[in-house]
C-alpha cells in the first residue's frame, strides 16, 4: 500500500482534501470547481445514468480541466463495485486514463489490476478494520475511512480506531 500520494498529484493540491462523492449531488460542475480550486473532485459513477453518460462526463471534465489556467487537481470517480454496470464503468475509466479512483460497496480486487495497469491509484472505502485489511490485501493504494459521523454510507467506528490499528 502506498504511504503517501505521489508528487504528480500532491503538487496540484492546495489542500489535502477530497470533495466527497455525493450520490445524486456530485456532478461535472462540482467536480470541475473542486479540481480547479486545488482539491480532488470525486463523484459516484452512478450519478451518470449510463456508461455512455459517464464517458461524456469524463470527456467534459477532462476538457474543462485541461482548459483551466492553472494545473488542476485530479478528478476521482467513485466506482461502485456491486453495480451491474461495474465492468462497463471500469472499462470507461481505463479508457479515460483516470489518475485516482475510489472503490466502494465491495472489495476493490476486481478493479485493481486494470486501474494499476494505467497507473491509477485505487482508494478503497472501508467501514471496519476487517474491510481495511481485505482492501489492502486486494492491492488498494489507500483507504477512505467511513467512520461514525461521516455522510452517506457511514461506518460505526470512531476514526481514531483505524489510526490505532
PLM-predicted stretches and their roles:
Residues 1-165:
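Active-site entrance/lid segments in N-terminal catalytic domains of soluble metabolic enzymes
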Amino acid at each position: 500500500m502506498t504511504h503517501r500520494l505521489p508528487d504528480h498529484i500532491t503538487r496540484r493540491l492546495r489542500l489535502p482534501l477530497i470533495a466527497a462523492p455525493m450520490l445524486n449531488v456530485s456532478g461535472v460542475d462540482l467536480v470541475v470547481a473542486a479540481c480547479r480550486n486545488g482539491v480532488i473532485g470525486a463523484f459516484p459513477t452512478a450519478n451518470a445514468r449510463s456508461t455512455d453518460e459517464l464517458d461524456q462526463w469524463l470527456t467534459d471534465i477532462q476538457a474543462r480541466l485541461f482548459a483551466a489556467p492553472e494545473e488542476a487537481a485530479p478528478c476521482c470517480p467513485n466506482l461502485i463495485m456491486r453495480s451491474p454496470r461495474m465492468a462497463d464503468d471500469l472499462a470507461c475509466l481505463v479508457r479515460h486514463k483516470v489518475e485516482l479512483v475510489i472503490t466502494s460497496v465491495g472489495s476493490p480486487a476486481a478493479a485493481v489490476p486494470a486501474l494499476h495497469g494505467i497507473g491509477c491509484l485505487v482508494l478503497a472505502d472501508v467501514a471496519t478494520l476487517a474491510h481495511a485489511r481485505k482492501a489492502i490485501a486486494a492491492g488498494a493504494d489507500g483507504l477512505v475511512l467511513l467512520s461514525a459521523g461521516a455522510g452517506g454510507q457511514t461506518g460505526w467506528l470512531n476514526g481514531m480506531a483505524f489510526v490505532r490499528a
